[in-house]
Amino acid sequence: MLTERQLLILQTIIDDFIGSAQPVGSRTLAKKDAITFSSATIRNEMADLEELGFIEKTHSSSGRVPSEKGYRFYVDHLLAPQNLPKDEIVQIKDLFAERIFEAEKIAQQSAQILSELTNYTAIVLGPKLSTNKLKNVQIVPLDRQTAVAIIVTDTGHVQSKTITVPESVDLSDLEKMVNILNEKLSGVPMSELHNKIFKEIVTVLRGYVHNYDSAIKMLDGTFQVPLSEKIYFGGKANMLSQPEFHDIHKVRSLLTMIDNEAEFYDILRHKQVGIQVKIGRENSATAMEDCSLISATYSIGEEQLGTIAILGPTRMQYSRVISLLQLFTRQFTDGLKK
């Protein structure tokens, strides 16, 4: 159990180091208004905090820096909510104020804005396409044998693919098919489209389309689209601006991981509800052992739809990032309810 004096010194060391990226010595602490005790007392308390594992020495300075244990204690017990500037709140709310809420577009823009507001790397895992509902489908002929099928969902996701049009299917058949599909399938979840088409729509099409078998075969290929989440990054190179990562050898594996993107699918899937903070080696990926990852989920009711996360150095502005993520996830959740 830390004393009140030790708590104050630990919080002051971490706050100062987060802001300056410089090791903190007793002389620096003695100049702080909140620290009213002698330099000797400060040194003794710092020695105790170091022995307890909350701070540690660096090779290049006589000052101390927070350890992972120190950051964890800080996040769990010392962190105070930070009020965001009014202009930032307005900027974020404006993003979600559009009359037509397109989740894909919002997810992409959220990653960009968060990276700009924090100068860290922002990652947004969008909703699974399987949870989207079909808004409409278009089939646009390119020539006699090919066409582009354009599928639009209620979240604004647009999926297009080139399909082969059988010789036996004419343009009037295509037009009839599209009209029937939009009439019968609008509002149906993407994950249910295949069953809906082959249990109900095929019966309807039989009465309207000539060359029925060829049309159904083409239709089957049209709706074979990936239903997994999309991941969006903002500020992929922002880590290079952090003093901790000026050594390119140290940051190379992290940048490779960010650039490949795939590992973040597993990291961000199945997150617990609410704000989660992973510090240093608490992260499963070795490339992230000098980083902190703060994530938050957004959902509708009990259904978790996606994750918003910020990746930065362990010397991260935890309070500010958490406040930003809370605002973003709240706005995202409200937008999805529109």
Curated annotation (Swiss-Prot):
SUPFAM superfamilies: GAF domain-like, Winged helix' DNA-binding domain. Pfam families: HrcA. Gene3D superfamilies: 3.30.450.40, Heat-inducible transcription repressor hrca homolog, domain 3, Winged helix-like DNA-binding domain superfamily/Winged helix DNA-binding domain. GO terms for molecular function: DNA binding. Keywords: Repressor, Stress response, Transcription, Transcription regulation. One of its GO terms (biological process) is negative regulation of DNA-templated transcription. Belongs to the HrcA family. Negative regulator of class I heat shock genes (grpE-dnaK-dnaJ and groELS operons). Prevents heat-shock induction of these operons. This is Heat-inducible transcription repressor HrcA. The gene is hrcA.
